[in-house]
Amino acid sequence: THDFMRF
């Protein structure tokens, strides 16, 4: 969902 988390 988040680009930095990649979920």
From Swiss-Prot:
GO terms for cellular component: extracellular region. It is found in: Secreted. Keywords: Amidation, Neuropeptide, Secreted. It comes from the Eukaryota. Its main location: secreted. The modification Phenylalanine amide is found at residue 7. The keyword Flavoprotein does not apply. The keyword Transmembrane helix does not apply. GO terms for biological process: neuropeptide signaling pathway. Belongs to the FARP (FMRFamide related peptide) family. This is FMRFamide-15. It comes from Sarcophaga bullata.
